[in-house]
Amino acid sequence: MVMPLAVINAGACVNEGAIINTAAVVEHDCIIGAYAHICPRVALAGNVTVGERVQVGIGSCVIQGLSIGANSIVGAGSVVVKNIAADVVAFGNPAQECRNLV
């Protein structure tokens, strides 16, 4: 589902059940996993891979070419400057993994 004012650029792939919320930007060649939630005003630079069932919190930014592993949560307002593992909570500027979800 793509909400109003969201931007999805060329070559991006949004899989089944994913939500691209209001005013989010998904740049070229990003891959958004099934059932992921890209919250309002998130900016994903080019070639970002977001795993299945990931939530990227409101106003977060993800630097080009990075990956966020399946089932992870990125806190609101975070700046992701390195890959995020699967099944973790990460937040901050720069985003740091702070706890496991399993």
Descriptions of predicted regions:
Residues N100-V102:
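Short hydrophobic/aromatic patches at helix-to-coil boundaries
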Residues M1-F91, A95-C98:
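Structural signal for interior beta-strand "rungs" in well-ordered beta-sheet cores
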